[in-house]
Amino acid sequence: PGYNHVSFAGYPMEFLGTDTVTISVGQQQFQQVIPLQATKNYQFHIIHHSHNDIGYSHLQTEVERIQTKNIIDALSWISNNEAIGEKAVWHIESLWAVENFLRNADEPQIQAFVQAVKSGNFVLSANYANVLTGLSQREELNWLVEYAKQLEKKYDILVSNAMITDIPGITHAGLENYTRNNIPYLSLGPNYVENLPDHGDRVGGVIKENGDQVFYWKVAPEAKEKLLVWTAGKGYSYFHNIQDNEKEAKWESRISAYVHQLESTHYPYDIVQLRYTKNADNGPVDTRLGQFVKAWNERYASPTLIVSNVDTLFALFEEKYGDQIPVLTGEISPYWEDGAYSTAVEEMENRALSQQTIAMEAYARKTSQWDTYSKDFYALHRNIILFHEHTWGSWCSISDPALFFTTEQWRIKKSFLDSAHQQYNRLSKHLGFNYVPKDAARTVSKSIISDFQVDLTTGGIAHVIVENMDIVGRENPYDLMEMVYSKGISPMEFSRSKNIKILHQEDSKDQKSIELSMELEGVKNMTIKYLWIKNTNRISCYASFDKMETFEKESMHIAFPFQTSDWKLAYGDEESMLNYPQDQLPGSNKEFICVSQQVELTNDSRKISIQAPAFSLYEVGAIIDETKVNGAKVWNREAAPTNPLFLYLLNNYWHTNYKASQGGHFSFDVQLDIE
């Protein structure tokens, strides 16, 4: 009695039709007619690696030791398997681990490492770490592959791929970074949790719409450079939490289920990318993988398992299916960047540091000082990148925020930012560099703006008169640039400003300004200043407040409602603007977009540009809804209305990794340009 799992010899691959299976239990017999259909002999190419969270599962210092040990263990595994003729391939998804290893390795270890890379037994991803591309400036993404270029030059090796693990989605600039740096292959292994509605934690449509999809990405259809992008259909974590004594049974079950899925969805290829991380994040090397694969292939005619190299896998796929691979452009708009705004003050600082470093680097090259300080720039780049690495804190950061394991991880995370500040200040002094923001509005002989008016019951702008027309939308409940505080998740409670007082106002021939103080839940000492310089078409908002710390779920937003509903939305920077939703690839985030520089709303008569240099995220159509379904947020699949927009200032909505509460002083500006 009870549940029994029985394996028996199957049928030859060529056998088709039906058969009857008879099961005898005591004196009873049960019969089941089984249809036998043609199936492909799938080749599952195992890409074995350890997902490198710099923190989360362990303190960052312990992760460094774990990943160094993994490299040493993998070198031993490769050496031992060569002796018995079994294939061993180990992938390193984050070169942070390689830099740590090489810093302390002896010469024989370094030689063994380089030889393993050249032989294809060690496969390096070009990424220094798994970063959130939606937080990063275009030039900053170059720093992500900077160490890979150093390794190539120093050891005469070639790094041909990038592996992004856990993170769902990648920006257009993130994709272009690889083509610009001549990296031909991108393996995406997003977060995967079978029993969640989207089959992953806050992954939106990435798994369901983009899993097992292969395409060439180009910056534009006519571009010559291309990137082969392949999302592993079961992410990177399909084999987590499997003990060695249950490996055979659970792999058989999960591979079988995967084959059925591939058949039912009419997967057009017979080659499958299968990411494999053992046990959990920052897991070990499976030194018995070769024996397991050999035993599997001796036991089963189909499917075949292969211990593979991601570079040779992608090359094999191109060779076999190259003429069938579609060419796409755009981005897989990402999802996890919202968590960074659980530490909004620090993220604003790192974003500013990135922008300032980009300008300082241009200055150093212009003044012929780059070569002298290139190592200092590398150290600065490294810390900015590490703050944008996707691991913000511990796995129990929300459930146990006061635990030393949690607070120490945040201390170390913040130390990357603190170190970057020190390095920037020291380097700018040596270079004689003073940063000047590029935020000056274009002057005009006569502004198309004739007036703006503030609503003293909301603190927002009620009217902006442009060529005798009011551009502020009145059907939306919020005024233009109004601050909105949201408490809770389901249902959300929205709070608006109150006790608004005028601190200063001016309306002269040169400018109109009004400075307000106000009260808003969750903050104190809030002041807002609106400014229109009358020989420009820009209205600026300068905000300052002190955030009060709370563990209750919360968020803050700035509203941008406009008249009419026919606005077209574009976002990006001066090099590239994307159209929402036309330039979003399948699986993209439709609820908020990641913006490097500005958003633009256009219709037949107007163009409105919004710049918020301190922030990355804009919610489209509505303030984000964090209602849970079976304990998880389910993301909208349909495009949202492009009006209104909301600048997403802060939140603590995550259930893990990011911070449970935040405080600190906020000071920032938002620029609204009208044409």
Question: In which residue ranges do the predicted regions lie?
Answer:
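Active-site cores of enzymes that catalyze phosphoryl transfer or operate on phosphate-rich substrates
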Residues: N80-G85, V89-S94, F101-L124, E209-S256, ...
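C-terminal (or distal) subdomains of carbohydrate-active enzymes
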Residues: G174-T179, N191, G211-Q213, H240, ...
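Active-site and substrate-binding clefts of carbohydrate-active enzymes
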Residues: Q43-H45, S50-D53, V203-V436, Y571-E675
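Short, surface-exposed connector motifs at secondary-structure boundaries
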Residues: K154-N161, D270-L274, R538-S540
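Extended acidic/polar, glycine-enriched regions
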Residues: P1-F44
